[in-house]
Regions:
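N-terminal cap/lid segment of alpha/beta-hydrolase-fold proteins
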Residues: 1-18
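Alpha/beta-hydrolase
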Residues: 145-305
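Catalytic active-site module of serine/aspartate enzymes centered on a nucleophile-bearing elbow/loop
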Residues: 277-358
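Conserved HGGG/HGGXW glycine-rich cap/lid loop of the alpha/beta-hydrolase fold
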Residues: 17-77
Length: 358
């Protein structure tokens, strides 16, 4: 897939995966590493990469399972974000980067939480755009991430709509069904009526993903507990289950505590206290039969969980800033780029000056 102006791409082999990596800026610039979300590739960062201040070198790889990554290399969901983190650290080593700011969108935010816990010494700052909850996606009931069921029912690959999976397999880029990727992005990600100028490129990038029981969304495992599925072994959505995700409180004991910028849209329905795809949200709307009610199966307080962990992080010696972008959906970096870049660039400059370059 061709890149946007100001961005180049090349194929690289690092660690256990061969993948496509996007670059922007001067080769001797301060490196900034980007990670994108579910249903996306590095293409989604191209405008942000190209808009970086001239002293920075933007880097964004396609994650395993997506885009230009080797389709033979799968995600072991039982490691949570572990495979993605290992791939990213291997890329840093290959590029001879000691420390870098990390930028995470959606699932890329979950990768950032894991990096903060296990590789804090590699991070100059953490910059989040609509990040996933540090407790993963669905299956928990309070800000402390308490699982609703012992088997973590309500999280994992069963969250993905089978009709969306069918359209992904068919590579349908249209809007003839409410379950095509374009329809899903318009409803859940962009925030109606917003349609990005390069929507065609973003949809094409999403359709590059590998779909199946060992890829996206992964294997679905039955559970006796409503909504009658639990996390499986493979793929990105199972990897997001709180069963597999790294304990977020591990960041409290990390030897380095990089400053965190958390930017979110005020109208985000993909990551929210009661996200649109949360089984409890769908149950309350009458769209998922058998919902036992909010006492037995409440919606996950994703934003509340993020703030809870970051407040603990601040008490443990870290710092964070929360910025809420008005009239904005799930990806402020894409749909409100001026607002996002203003705070993002300021954070980059202040934290790289304080922490030194690579």
């Amino acid at each position: 897939m061709p890149t946007n102006d100001g961005v180049t791409a090349r194929t690289m082999k690092t660690g256990g995966v061969t993948t496509r990596v996007h670059f922007s800026g001067p080769e001797d610039g301060t490196p900034v590493m980007f990670n994108q979300g579910t249903l996306t590739t590095a293409t989604w960062w191209e405008e942000t990469l190209a808009a970086l201040p001239v002293e920075f070198r933007g880097i964004s790889p396609d994650r395993r399972g997506f885009g230009g990554a080797d389709p033979a290399v799968k995600v072991d969901a039982t490691r949570g974000m572990g495979d993605y983190v290992d791939d990213l650290v291997a890329l840093l080593d290959e590029l001879d980067i000691d420390k870098t700011p990390i930028v995470g969108m959606s699932l890329g935010g979950n990768i950032a939480w894991h990096l903060m816990a296990d590789h804090s010494e590699r991070l100059l700052s953490v910059n989040l755009s609509g990040p996933g909850s540090p407790y993963g996606f669905c299956g928990t009931k309070d800000v402390e991430g308490t699982p609703i069921h012992d088997d973590f029912a309500g999280s994992g690959a069963g969250l993905s709509n089978p009709l969306l999976i069918e359209q992904l397999k068919a590579k349908n880029a249209g809007i003839d069904s409410p379950f095509t990727v374009r329809s899903a992005l318009r409803l859940l990600v962009w925030k109606p009526p917003v349609i990005p100028e390069r929507e065609d490129a973003f949809v094409a990038a999403s359709l590059e993903m590998q779909v199946g029981e060992d890829s996206y969304p992964g294997d679905v495992v039955e559970s006796p507990n409503w909504p009658h599925f639990k996390p499986g072994r493979w793929g990105s959505i199972n990897a997001l289950s709180p069963k597999h995700i790294r304990d977020p409180k591990a960041i409290l004991d990390a030897p380095n505590k990089p400053p965190v910028l958390w930017v979110r849209g005020d109208a985000d329905v993909a990551v929210a206290d009661g996200a649109a795809s949360d089984p409890a949200t769908l149950g309350a709307m009458g769209l998922k039969p058998g919902w036992p009610g909010p006492e037995e199966h409440p919606a996950q307080p994703m934003v509340g969980q993020t703030r809870y962990i970051l407040d603990l992080y601040a008490e443990a010696g870290g710092t964070y800033e929360e910025v809420v972008v008005a009239d904005c959906g799930h990806v402020p970096s894409m749909t409100k780029p001026d607002e996002f870049n203003r705070v993002f660039h300021a954070h980059l400059k202040s934290t790289t000056q304080a922490g030194g370059q690579q």
